[in-house]
């Protein structure tokens, strides 16, 4: 989606933001990807709700905590050396009223971890088969693809046969769908989606949304690889 296409939609549009955090920004290596500040600035200038997926310490999958991610966003919007000015009269530091702030009440932050579809994605299982498997998991009320049950081979639908083939091929790497709420995703139907990585965690979120016909608009210039 191009910038000019969302200008007319208003600032209150919902946003899904995936993995915009220090660990993936390059800042820890002294080489921050320029798209990260652009994403943060864009999200902060909007006024609608934000569903923010992160990989944080709750899942043990990155060196970031939710608090350090929020601090990274705050510092990006207004660096610490600009946030306060020294007051000679009080001999203390005053908060700069012109420094922009992030309204964290707009945000729902989900520490999702990662890798729930990645083995299948990286192995080259077709997206349509992954989506069909996700739908089957919810229909059977299962969270792990190894728990799926199907009728005998002569009674299966072609789609069920494709799922079974993928399950057998990926026997040691199941799909898991217990990492987020589908009802929560549905509340963000039509949302802008930003972040990344394009073919990794962001793509996992897109596949889950597609499985339940939840629409989204990817802003390509605000997606990192």
Enumerate the predicted regions with their spans.
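Active-site acidic carboxylates
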Residues: 2-144, 152, 206-218
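Short acidic/polar capping segments at secondary-structure boundaries
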Residues: 22, 115, 197-199, 222-224
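A short glycine-rich beta-strand->turn/loop micro-motif centered on a GG-aromatic cluster
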Residues: 192-196, 214-225
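Surface-exposed cleft-lining segments at the edges of enzyme active sites
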Residues: 24-34, 161-171, 188-194
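Alpha-helical scaffold elements lining the catalytic groove of polysaccharide deacetylases
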Residues: 117-187
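Amphipathic coiled-coil/heptad-repeat helices and related helical stalk/stem segments
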Residues: 35-39, 175-181, 202
């Amino acid at each position: 989606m191009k910038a000019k296409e969302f200008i007319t939609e208003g600032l209150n549009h919902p946003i899904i933001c995936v993995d915009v955090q220090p660990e993936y920004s390059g800042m820890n290596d002294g080489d921050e990807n320029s798209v990260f500040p652009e994403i943060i600035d864009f999200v902060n200038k909007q006024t609608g709700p934000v569903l923010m997926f992160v990989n944080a310490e709750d899942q043990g999958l990155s060196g970031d905590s939710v608090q350090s991610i929020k601090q990274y966003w705050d510092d990006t919007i207004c660096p610490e050396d600009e946030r306060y000015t020294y007051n000679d009269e009080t001999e203390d530091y005053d908060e700069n009223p012109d420094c922009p702030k992030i309204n964290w009440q707009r945000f729902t932050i989900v520490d999702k971890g990662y890798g729930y579809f990645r083995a299948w994605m990286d192995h080259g299982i077709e997206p349509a088969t992954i989506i069909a498997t996700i739908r089957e998991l919810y229909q059977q009320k299962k969270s792990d693809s190894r728990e799926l049950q199907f009728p005998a081979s002569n009674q299966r639908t072609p789609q069920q046969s494709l799922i079974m083939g993928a399950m057998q091929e990926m026997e040691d790497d199941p799909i898991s769908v217990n990492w987020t709420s589908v009802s929560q995703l549905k509340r963000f139907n039509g949302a802008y989606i930003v972040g990344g990585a394009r073919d990794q965690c962001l793509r996992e979120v897109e596949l889950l949304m597609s499985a339940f016909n939840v629409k989204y608009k990817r802003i390509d210039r605000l997606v990192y690889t």
